[in-house]
């Protein structure tokens, strides 16, 4: 009887806990896979937007300074 209890405990408690940990890893892998399939042109646009920074003013409205009083990085 004790052996059957141990087997049931392993099958009903420990095995599901082990599989839940594996399920938690899948969304991260899917996200990384989606990033790899990104078009290189789209990836460049994302990087360029990040490199421009927060203080960049809109080129059409540029008067040489951003709202924080610093020099614009996009229009000099």
From Swiss-Prot:
It comes from the Eukaryota. One of its GO terms (cellular component) is extracellular region. InterPro entries: Conotoxin. It holds the Pfam family Conotoxin. The lineage of its organism: Eukaryota, Metazoa, Spiralia, Lophotrochozoa, Mollusca. This is Conotoxin reg3.10. Coiled coil: none annotated. GO terms for molecular function: ion channel inhibitor activity; toxin activity. Residues 21-55 form a propeptide. Keywords: Amidation, Disulfide bond, Secreted, Signal, Toxin. Disulfide bonds join 56-74, 57-72, 62-75. The modification Cysteine amide is found at residue 75. Expressed by the venom duct.
